[in-house]
């Protein structure tokens, strides 16, 4: 999360950063001849998809990326919306659980969807569950050669596709939580196109399918009947393209 256009990072849970003057550090490293611009990574990725990818030519789009964490970029009337304090699109911190029993999130709060469906938390849960003394007998473990630490979300997705009970149950828990966050955003923003991407979703097609099905049930029909749901197209190039174009527009 950025505090200001100078690039002060308020909180980057997956990097362990709080109140880091990244813009100043970057400017010092680049020198005075190279202007430094700092953008939220998912905003840059979303803008890259708007300029040259899955949201190209669409004036109202929501791009959601589920990787190590979860974030979104909001495009409205052809413009990137970053909000009054640059926090627009922080969909990973939409609450899907409450109370002391809710999962802790790196942002310092509890119950955020990222604390359940973010890739780092999913990987940790898989390892913890399958390494437990009374671990479920899951095909996902066999797919990874029997090593709980080697089991990836891709293995779990494949196991679920093959009918594995534990994998189906776990995905059946995560998909509705992601759908709550997506459905709330779709109801609030009414995008024409929803772009889905990120390292986790791109490798777990069944989880993506289940989340989309749950989303269509969770959001109002008036908001979804014309909604196009597509996969991100640009991969790792999206952020570079988006940041370059945003920097060009900032000068």
Question: Residues of each region from the PLM?
Answer:
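Active-site and channel-lining beta-strand-loop segments
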Residues: 1-3, 70-76, 80
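ATP-binding/phosphotransfer module of carbohydrate and carboxylate kinases, centering on a glycine-rich
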Residues: 3-6, 24-36, 48-60, 80, ...
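A charged helix-plus-loop insertion that forms the helical arch/lid used to bind
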Residues: 7-18
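Glycine/small-residue-rich loop that forms an oxyanion/phosphate-binding "nest" at active or ligand-binding sites
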Residues: 37-43
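Short beta-strand segments
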Residues: 39, 63-69, 73-75, 95, ...
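Adenylate-forming
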Residues: 45-51, 72-74, 93-95
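Structural signature of FAD isoalloxazine-binding scaffolds in flavoprotein oxidoreductases
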Residues: 87-92
